[in-house]
Amino acid sequence: MARCRMPRWGLLLVLWGSCTFGLPADTGAFRRIFLKKMPSIRESLKERGVDVAGLGAEWNQFTKRLSSGNSTSPVVLTNYLDTQYYGEIGIGTPPQTFKVVFDTGSANLWVPSTRCSPLYTACEIHCLYDSSESSSYMENGTTFTIRYGSGKVKGFLSQDMVTVGGITVTQTFGEVTELPLIPFMLAKFDGVLGMGFPAQAVGGVTPVFDHILSQGVLKEEVFSVYYSRNSHLLGGEVVLGGSDPQYYQGNFHYVSISKTGSWQIKMKGVSVRSATLVCEEGCMVVVDTGASYISGPTSSLRLLMDTLGAQELSTNEYVVNCNQVPTLPDISFHLGGRAYTLTSKDYVLQDPYGNEDLCTLALHGLDVPPPTGPVWVLGASFIRKFYTEFDRHNNRIGFALAR
């Protein structure tokens, strides 16, 4: 087995685990990537006593600056401060291992590079891609920048063999040379593997999943995502080529995507106690596997939070007294003619580092101006309840009640 280039702070690898790559077993009809659930960056900051209110304000200011963007600096709505799930992939020959977030909100693959500047301390505690250790590396050199709500990454493009779920493709990916300290210093993942559409990719790069589809090795042109609600067991799983019945019950209900080249669908309202409170005239929603929370326009969230009796603790972060949780009402999201209902157990976070008297809600305000927004985001808090299938062949998203 090959290893990724060890960070220069070798001792810190104890905290982040080994960089040794092992391929998952070929399960026949499906190809699987097992996911591990981790504390989010926000949780890690809270554990260390860091006031995260300022980070929320920074995210809010970022969304206010959003515009149509351009091909060299695309806008990605995912806020990795709250991302909790990652899986392993291999890059190079022999493969170097990286822990990545599988993110339907973006379309590029990037990992930190050995060419990362020593000034960027966040690189020091992650596995670094070393092109000199790979016999299949091909130089590209095109520079790129990707802006996220929680920072931006810069680097250059390279080409190498990438192995995902036992499938190997020739892939152009990003070697990141500028990785911001906040938030990536405390990230348990090394990089991001975008599962979005080609239109979302920086630099005209063909996404990993499209290269996999071109090989014709999958039974269906779909992938599905399961996030476990039990943190003591398997964190989750990405299934390439289909959906696994052991993770859901009943049948899938499908909703066609509403925007070509994006995992975006229409929502017909958000209701509490059978009353539609917001999005009465319909609104757009992105199903984002890289996001943890459910986000929506600030004005809509505040109305929803007032109904729940929640208070705004910091910028767009809401809490309730923990003794209120059992009496909080259900929240329903109306998609494709059906109501997808979350109970308080689904939308209240278990925060072992926070105030024992206050419980954080997995709902955030997110103001995105036109033409990108306004938009809602359904992240892991929703996907944990509803097993989700992303169907590229039919341009639709399917939901089924998770087991």
Curated annotation (Swiss-Prot):
Keywords: Aspartyl protease, Cleavage on pair of basic residues, Disulfide bond, Glycoprotein, Hydrolase, Membrane, Protease, Secreted, Signal, Zymogen. Coiled coil: none annotated. PROSITE patterns: ASP_PROTEASE, PEPTIDASE_A1. Residues 23-65 form a propeptide. Disulfide bonds join C116-C123, C279-C283, C322-C359. Its main location: secreted. Interaction with ATP6AP2 results in a 5-fold increased efficiency in angiotensinogen processing. It is found in: Secreted; Membrane. Glycans are attached at N70, N140. The active site is at D103, D288. InterPro entries: Aspartic_peptidase_A1, Aspartic_peptidase_AS, Aspartic_peptidase_N, PEPTIDASE_A1, Peptidase_aspartic_dom_sf, Renin-like_dom. It catalyses: Cleavage of Leu-|-Xaa bond in angiotensinogen to generate angiotensin I. GO terms for cellular component: extracellular space; membrane. Pfam families: A1_Propeptide (PF07966), Asp (PF00026). Its EC number is 3.4.23.15. CDD domains: renin_like. GO terms for biological process: angiotensin maturation. GO terms for molecular function: aspartic-type endopeptidase activity. Residues 85-400 form the Peptidase A1 domain. Renin is a highly specific endopeptidase, whose only known function is to generate angiotensin I from angiotensinogen in the plasma, initiating a cascade of reactions that produce an elevation of blood pressure and increased sodium retention by the kidney. Interacts with ATP6AP2. This is Renin. It comes from Canis lupus familiaris. The lineage of its organism: Eukaryota, Metazoa, Chordata, Craniata, Vertebrata.
